[in-house]
């Protein structure tokens, strides 16, 4: 029979060789997908919550299945990006985001805070840009695997 300290030593050695896992979230894309995929849930006060429900369900699933060491959410901010400077018609055909989704996007920051998830956003850049930058920076760290969670096909 192995001694408990011997087992712990082997377990620690195995964990040292194991890579850490970083999950990156495209917050806007995830919320947008949840908003359109789920019913129009609302709180007693009438506040829309369907996209937030979808977000929480997804976060719980990611945490349970992927067991990440780190999670980061990236947001788009309102306003033009450097892409608008390069191409004046960038996203020109897009419909205005519905107010009930905008409210949930704003409230999602509270959800991420409750989960202890760090948020990144930067004027002039989209979440995709930040995700790509984080991935490029993380590639330099050989001990971290990156998983991107997004509902956006161009991420």
Model-found features: residue ranges?
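Noncatalytic, basic helical substrate-engagement surface that gates or grips nucleic-acid strands
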Residues: 2-149, 153-155
